Amino acid sequence: MKVIFLQDVKGQGKKDEIKEISDGYARNFLIPKGLVKLATEGSVKTVKNRKIVQEQEKDLAIAETKQLKTLLEEIILKFKLQINEGKAFHSISNQDIVDQLKNSHKIDLDKRKFVNFKNLNQIGLHYIVIKLGFGIEAKLKVEIQGV
């Protein structure tokens, strides 16, 4: 019996997968529990169309992420730290960076996307790695100046 999986079934199939299953297993277990439905021409077309739409949405999201990466890598964020005798009285946290990106560049990021981030308290140019998703990482430049 040809069925369409409505959700993931361990050892059998994944959601929206079309697969041939034994009649008894499908009728007695999978269909009554709402895990699968019969694969008719209309339902198969619907599943294929849904997969095409999902693929297009994923491609669009990847393109937007790549565009965000390009934008982030062009930005240089500047912070000023009060320094006395070579020691900083304050440090720049990932939340400070997120806030400045949001306020000055209208870019909204989650502070948990920063890779191996440690608060910045040294004068100079720092590179921050940010995971954007889909395996794409951006290097943001942060310049700290002493006051």
From Swiss-Prot:
GO biological process: translation
Name of the gene this protein is made from: rplI
Positions in coiled-coil regions: none
Organism classification: Bacteria, Bacillati, Mycoplasmatota, Mollicutes, Entomoplasmatales
Gene3D superfamilies on file: Ribosomal protein L9, C-terminal domain (3.10.430.100), Ribosomal protein L9, N-terminal domain (3.40.5.10)
Highest taxon above the source species: Bacteria
GO MF annotation, one: structural constituent of ribosome
Organism: Mesoplasma florum (strain ATCC 33453 / NBRC 100688 / NCTC 11704 / L1)
Cited InterPro entries: Ribosomal_bL9, Ribosomal_bL9/RNase_H1_N, Ribosomal_bL9_bac/chp, Ribosomal_bL9_C, Ribosomal_bL9_C_sf, Ribosomal_bL9_N, Ribosomal_bL9_N_sf
Family per record: Belongs to the bacterial ribosomal protein bL9 family.
One of the record's GO cellular component terms: ribosome
Name of the protein: Large ribosomal subunit protein bL9
